[in-house]
A protein has these predicted regions:
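Aspartic protease core domain of the pepsin/retropepsin superfamily
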Residues: 187, 197-314, 425-469
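Aspartic protease catalytic domain
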Residues: 2-50, 113-115, 123-128, 139, ...
Length: 469
């Protein structure tokens, strides 16, 4: 397909992320060790729904994020991680993309159970519970990204161990677990309700994930290993469109029951990912890595990563300033203060970046001022769209820069915020999130950068990268 067509589709897809994101974990009620690293191959999200639907779904996800951050009763994180395993080299899991399924998510291939059963899950930094569709799941039967329906069969797994509903883990740590417990030995149940009216219901326990370890020196063949006691939800009933494009969710959220915490505990206390251009073809891939990433060296910028309960299960950062064309914008400081009902989070499950109203108005006004000479067109859901071919010469796009605490500067490529919406049409690809409210840096703005979440030392590192293998 011509790049123009891909642009249309994938940016058309821009509106659907949060639903997919929700399926991926955004609207989910989900919520250290050897010098090894784990790689999960990521592939770009694909086009499918309309741009308006993508934007709508992102708004649903933003509402979910806001609701969780506003909650006054936050569950404690479960200390489910075990001691680091024996010295192992890199941990690599093959991943695939959600691009060809019509979602805006990045998918990972995940193997769980004994014997291992393969699944395609959404890699989601906003989720704290990994879950898969289970046998007996009641919902419209849809093909998984692999081409055929996949369901987890806990009865076939020798390593599956459900949590009793009477256990402290169920009552205190599992997000959105059900309070009813008629028999103490009954399995721990959950009922997730999403902002787009989707839901997922099932039981939770632990199982073993199969990972591929490779030598730390880069040599030698990969060898299989088991990551034990991974917290896993077995979803037996689900409703809505959010779950049609994947087999479930791989939780990368800020929670000790998430897969990210479990894997990072064994592989260096950190994980990283690099999102390729969201318009990249299906055969272009990147990686989700557990453990130190050699490619993220001295050239990286870094800023403190906020991991306290106030923002869990999300990853927050402090924004010091935003500038357009080298000019700092007048945005009130409280907009970036998570303790004052503001703040900013980095979210792989949201596609379009959503800014709190004061920041949105300032950024869009500055960008549109610089583009005043380009003919405007109307295209929902965006406020500013342009006929990009009207002048004959492609207009110059002003540089957007986000400066984080510690003087770390993010300068995303212009295609990450002035996006392709239709043939010959570009839009300022940002959404207004209201105020008070949190701002969300979506996966489009994150593309073509390597992001490392150093959980052990509470740093977020990033640098520009093409990401492709």
């Amino acid at each position: 397909m011509a790049r123009c067509g891909v642009a249309v589709l994938v940016l058309i897809l821009l509106a659907c992320v949060a639903a997919a994101a929700a399926a991926g974990g955004g609207d989910h009620h989900h919520r250290r060790g050897s010098r090894a690293s784990a790689r999960l191959q990521l592939v770009p999200a694909a086009p499918g729904a309309s741009l308006a639907e993508r934007a709508r779904d992102d708004r649903h996800r933003h509402a979910y994020i806001s609701t969780r951050l506003a909650s006054s009763s936050r569950r404690r994180a479960a200390e489910t991680s075990t001691a680091p395993g024996p010295e192992a080299s890199a941990f690599a899991m093959p991943l695939t993309s959600g691009a060809y399924t019509g979602t805006g998510q990045y998918f990972v291939r995940f193997r769980v159970g004994t014997p291992a059963q393969p699944f395609v899950l959404v890699a989601d930094t906003g989720s704290d519970l990994t879950w898969v569709k289970c046998r007996g799941a009641s919902s419209p039967s849809a093909a998984s990204p692999s081409g055929s329906p996949r369901v987890f069969r806990p009865a076939d797994s020798k390593s599956w161990a459900p949590f009793p509903c009477s256990s402290d883990t169920c009552k205190s740590y599992v997000p959105f677990s059900l309070a009813n417990c008629s028999a103490g030995t009954a399995p721990c149940s959950y009922d997730y309700r999403y902002k787009d009216n989707s839901s997922a219901r099932g039981v939770v326990g632990t199982d073993a994930a199969t990972i591929a370890l490779s030598g730390s020196n880069g040599g030698g063949a990969d060898r299989k290993a088991k990551l034990q006691e991974v917290v896993l939800g077995c979803t037996t009933s689900y409703d809505g469109q959010s779950f049609q494009a994947s087999d479930g969710v791989l939780s990368l959220g800020n929670s000790n029951i998430s897969f990210a915490a479990r894997a990072a505990a064994r592989f260096g206390g950190r994980f990283s990912y690099c999102l390729v251009d969201h318009l990249a073809p299906r055969n272009t891939s990147s990686y989700l890595t557990f453990g130190p990433d050699a490619s993220n060296g001295a050239s990286s910028s870094r800023t403190p990563l906020l991991l306290d309960a106030l923002v869990a299960p999300f990853y927050a950062v402090t924004v010091d300033a935003v500038s357009v064309a080298g000019e700092a914008l007048d945005i009130p400081a409280e907009v970036w203060d998570v303790k004052r009902n503001g703040g900013a989070i980095l979210d792989s499950g949201t596609s379009l970046t959503i800014l709190a109203t004061p920041a949105y108005k300032a950024v869009v006004a500055a960008l549109s001022k610089q583009l005043a000479g380009v003919p405007r067109v109307t295209m929902d859901p965006f406020e500013y769209c342009y006929n990009w071919t009207a002048t004959g010469t492609p207009p110059a796009v002003p540089r957007l820069e986000v400066r984080f605490a510690g003087s770390a500067r993010l300068q995303p490529p212009t295609k990450s915020y002035v996006i392709d919406a239709a043939p010959g049409v570009k839009c300022i690809g940002l959404q207004e999130g209201g105020w008070p409210g949190v701002s969300v840096i979506g996966n489009i703005l994150q593309q073509e950068h390597l992001w490392e979440f150093d959980l052990a030392n509470r740093w977020l590192r990033f640098k520009e990268s093409r990401c492709a293998q």
